[in-house]
């Protein structure tokens, strides 16, 4: 949430890249994230739309200063597995997928 669509889009991407399970540094922002996450999970869409109690893994919100007369909101969605991975590359160019065990490149 920000004062311009450009800033809102940038903050939306920043929120998307935060680690799963992280909380907003601002207490009000953290409470807002929790409220949205609980609400989304109550509708019981579930993983892949197949019903269940966990519809989202988390909700991340970033905010910037804004004027009361305008509010821009940017929303980004994405699967955590498609945007984050940890790999260890050794001197002999062998590798180990730390975050996605068993996956090969």
Please annotate each region the language model reported:
Residues 1-105:
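Non-transmembrane, aqueous-exposed alpha-helical and coiled segments at domain scale
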């Amino acid at each position: 949430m920000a004062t311009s669509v450009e800033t809102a889009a940038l903050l939306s991407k920043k929120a998307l890249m935060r680690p799963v399970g992280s909380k907003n540094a601002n207490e009000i922002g953290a409470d807002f994230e929790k409220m949205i996450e609980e609400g989304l999970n109550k509708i019981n869409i579930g993983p892949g739309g197949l019903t269940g109690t966990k519809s989202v893994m988390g909700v991340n919100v970033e905010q910037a200063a804004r004027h009361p007369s305008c509010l821009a909101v940017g929303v980004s969605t994405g699967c955590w597995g498609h945007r984050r991975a940890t790999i260890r590359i050794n001197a002999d160019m062998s590798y180990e997928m730390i975050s996605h065990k068993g996956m090969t490149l």
